[in-house]
Amino acid sequence: MKTFIKERGLAFFLIAVVLLWIKTYVGYVLNFNLGIDNTIQKILLFVNPLSSSLFFLGFGLLFKKKLQQTAIIVIHFLMSFLLYANIVYYRFFNDFITIPVIMQAKTNGGQLGDSAFSLMRPTDAFYFIDTIILIILAIKVNKPAETSSKKSFRIIFASSILVFLINLAVAESDRPELLTRSFDRNYLVKYLGTYNFTIYDAVQNIKSNSQRALADSSDVTEVENYMKANYDVPNNVYFGKAEGKNVIYVSLESLQSFIIDYKIDGKEVTPFLNKLAHDNETFYFDNFFHQTGQGKTSDAEFMMENSLYPLAQGSVFVNKAQNTLQSVPAILKSKNYTSATFHGNTQTFWNRNEMYKAEGIDKFFDSAYYDMNEENTKNYGMKDKPFFKESMPLLESLPQPFYTKFITLSNHFPFGMDEGDTDFPAGDFGDSVVDNYFQSAHYLDQSIEQFFNDLKKDGLYDKSIIVMYGDHYGISENHNKAMAKVLGKDEITDYDNAQLQRVPLFIHAAGVKGEKVHKYAGDVDVAPTILHLLGVDTKDYLMSGSDILSKEHREVIPFRNGDFISPKYTKISGKYYDTKTGKELDESEVDKSEDSLVKKELEMSDKIINGDLLRFYEPKGFKKVNPSDYDYTKHDEDSSETSKDNEDK
């Protein structure tokens, strides 16, 4: 071996391999919570970077003598960058970067700078120091391998494949069917590593994209039979109770349920929302869970309006905007509803300008319609108070009945508020992100109260059903130490993390008697619930969700990674808990019927989305959406007409 290395000048290459290998392992241990349970998993975590280090750096050996070391350094840097990008991404999302997420950067990347920067640390220089060491070695030693290195490459390539196959075989013995049944990226990284996961993800992405081309009308039959068999008959007490009313959705950015009725220094953080939760004209759902994947806010929007699950990788908004959809706004067109979305950000963020056309949304009031001055904006766009204030004339200009959606932004990570925007005290839990969360949540609460008052003033309150929901978690698992203090616990366990995925859901309609609803439900359940309240039966539509107010409502809530929660079981990170007690259960104690249901639910939804199957299915009375009918370009007359309407009033 020594002779082989010396003769072929492979010392530089092997140094690069060892540096990348060890650095990657250190990165795993310091940054990722992968749930290592046994010695086999510990060994695999250490070994799995080796095969990919050999494989990718080995391509540098194919270059000619003068370029060889340069190629190895460039590949080493790119792999280091991929590792570091995953580390930064994981610090907030507790997830790993996928190919679709990289594609999302085209629409979102330019506006994510502040959030990404806040996640970086001075010690992160560690992940690039070894690249600098390699550059110095190349300059000082400058002794690349021999000119003809194809034989060396073949040996290195074969070695990397052998290491990978051994790695995979051991992983499969510990986690059978790892590559075929795992929705959870944590498992894939734990057993195979970030670099091998990226290859796996690329293959899955190609496979997903090919499903549309191969699909035909016969594929929709299985899905139709399954979803119609699981249709929930509406509750006669509530069906049609809000018929003819305007619909106003409000996305409550990053709001989690623990904040409701929570106090800081004796002061309620969200006094208006607290009051609303206990109002007799509000349906407040205290066991409602977000089910978002990597698309976060856009996933929540998609589920609310289409009652289908998000993608396993990436955002439906970004990757499937060409699909045929049967969204709530499109369904309500048969009832003469006009639809509009209000958002104090650019049209292209999350590819909304294209997705809304597929959903049949008539108007999109984006940042072009608002006064986006420095005082009114922060981070992702317009602050909530000026956003709602400036939205009112636009809302009043719409013909009624209308279906509208307002997307708030101020309560967004890292939750800092400008001076003068709030006098509410920050928390004192030793974590700036958690501490600031209470201030921005209070600001959001004040903006919602202002919005309700404006609706009453303009006569729209009594004519509308108002649906408000937390779009996704705000505080990630990286802040569990502070969150334990917030909740008065010694520590936050995996079970606790699952419970913290609760987000508030309010359905408020003046004149309609509400109640506190304890049923377990998720994002996909909202569309059928609202449509039934409006008097629209969903039996002919293909929806994953279940009317929460129905007596037949299903209370098993799938998460995108295959975990789930129900009144009986909580499955998180592959472990089962008793939902009522939090006690961990042995798999032998668990009725796996809920597991099977979750797998089937995700499978059916994925078939619809990846195969674009709704193009083959048209319910009676539904007019298929033609995206080319919609144009969200702001014209001068839009502003002048709104101004004229306000003057007339």
Curated annotation (Swiss-Prot):
Main location as per UniProt: membrane
Site features described as Cleavage, chain residue numbers: 215-216
Residues on Cytoplasmic side: 1-9, 64-69, 140-151
Catalytic residues identified in the record: 297
Segments traversing the membrane: 10-30, 43-63, 70-90, 119-139, 152-172
GO cellular component terms, A-Z: extracellular region; membrane; plasma membrane
Keyword terms of this UniProt record: Cell membrane, Cell wall biogenesis/degradation, Manganese, Membrane, Metal-binding, Secreted, Transferase, Transmembrane, Transmembrane helix
Top EC class for this record: transferase
Pathway: Cell wall biogenesis; lipoteichoic acid biosynthesis
Regions of this protein lying in the Extracellular compartment: 31-42, 91-118, 173-649
Chain residues that bind Mn(2+): 253, 297, 471-472
PTM comment text: Proteolytically cleaved.
EC number: 2.7.8.-
Annotated substrate binding sites: 412
PANTHER family: LIPOTEICHOIC ACID SYNTHASE, PHOSPHOGLYCEROL TRANSFERASE I
Function: Catalyzes the polymerization of lipoteichoic acid (LTA) polyglycerol phosphate, a reaction that presumably uses phosphatidylglycerol (PG) as substrate.
Protein name: Lipoteichoic acid synthase 2
Biological source species: Bacillus subtilis (strain 168)
Organism classification: Bacteria, Bacillati, Bacillota, Bacilli, Bacillales
Gene that encodes the chain: ltaS2
